[in-house]
UniProtKB/Swiss-Prot annotation:
One of its GO terms (biological process) is AMP salvage. Pathway: Purine metabolism; AMP biosynthesis via salvage pathway; AMP from adenine: step 1/1. This is Adenine phosphoribosyltransferase. InterPro entries: Ade_phspho_trans, Adenine_PRTase, PRibTrfase_dom, PRTase-like. Its EC number is 2.4.2.7. GO terms for molecular function: adenine phosphoribosyltransferase activity.
Amino acid sequence: MNTDKLALIKQSIKTIPDYPKPGIMFRDVTSLMEDPAAYQATIALFVERYKDLGVTKVVGTEARGFLFGAPLALELGVGFVPVRKPGKLPRETISESYELEYGHDMLEIHTDAIKPGDKVLVVDDLLATGGTIEATVKLIRQLGGEVEHAAFVISLPELGGEHRLAEMGLSLMTLCEFEGE
C-alpha cells in the first residue's frame, strides 16, 4: 500500500482522551473527512484493494460505515446497503443482536437488499471487538450473500476484533492501527 497515503490518513485522525468516558482514547474519523486529501486517499486505497474481486454490494454499518462504504460503492460501480439500528429501515427487515461491553444491541437489514450469491464487502470506520461486524455478516449470510472481506479505516488490535472476524473466514483490510496510545 502507498505509505504516503497511509501516513496522511493516520495523521488526520484526531485522538480525544477520556471520551466518551474516562480512560477511553476516542479515535475520531470525522477529522479525516474534514481533510479532502485524506478522505480521497482512504477511498482510493479501498478501491485499489477491492476493484478486481467481483464485489457486487458494499454494506456499511451505522453510522460511520456509511461515510466510507457509500463512496466506495460508487467508485466500484456497485450498490450500497446500510445496516441500521432497529426501527430505522422502512421495508421488511431481519435483525441480529450482538453483545456490548455492558448489555446488547441489535442491527437490521432490508430483506430484499442482498440477493443469494451477492459478493459482499463489509465496511466500517473502526474495528474494536468485532461484535458489530459479526452481527452484520450473519445478517448478510442469512440472506444468501457471500462475505469474504471486510475493510476498516482503524483497527484497535488489543480488543480482539481481528481474531474474531478471522474465525468467521473474513479477510480484513485496515488502514491504521492504534494501540492504546
